Structure formats: structure tokens, C-alpha cells
Amino acid sequence: MNKIDKNFSNQIIDEQRIDVWLFRSRLIKSRAKAQRVIHEGCIKINKIRTSKTSVKIRVGDIITLSKLDNVSIISVEDFAKRRLNAKEALKLYKEIKII
């Protein structure tokens, strides 16, 4: 019998708010900071800049995160039901490029 990890969505969740996902994936330290970064226009979803924290993302979406001098391009791989530890959070995304 397969053991199902209750921390991951296992595709039951087909979309999630961008601010929640950024926080749960540990790309940003707090949800409030994630919301601030989004409002400042530092996030693109599939090459479209967004300033709305309520935008829903799906598996396969490409997120561009601009922080100071760094630009990270990542692919959404999964969702989590809660904030994960650092090792587990790496399963939520795949880094495509860091500039």
C-alpha cells in the first residue's frame, strides 16, 4: 500500500494563490512579505507581471521572481497544504534559471 504524504496536494489542489504558494514553498519568508513583493511588481506569472496577491497559479506555471539584483525563474511543480521544511519545499518547484 502506498503511503500518501499529507503535506503535499497530490494534485487534489489544482490551483493556489501566488502569495500562499510563495510562502509555503519558502521562496519568501512570510506571507506578508510575499504580498508586499507582489504589490511591488516583482513577480511575473507566465511572463505577465502581476500586482494582485489573489492570482491563482497552476502546476506548470513559470514564475519570475525579481529580488534586488537577483532574478529567479522557476516552474511550479506541486502545491502544499501547509508551510514545509526546507527539504520538502524543494519538491514544490524546479529552478529553471537564476540570473
Which residues does each PLM region occupy?
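Strongly charged
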Residues: 1-20, 24, 36, 44-99
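Key DNA-contact positions within bacterial/archaeal DNA-binding proteins
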Residues: 32
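Glycine-centered, phosphate/nucleic-acid-interacting loop/turn motifs that mediate DNA/RNA or nucleotide
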Residues: 41
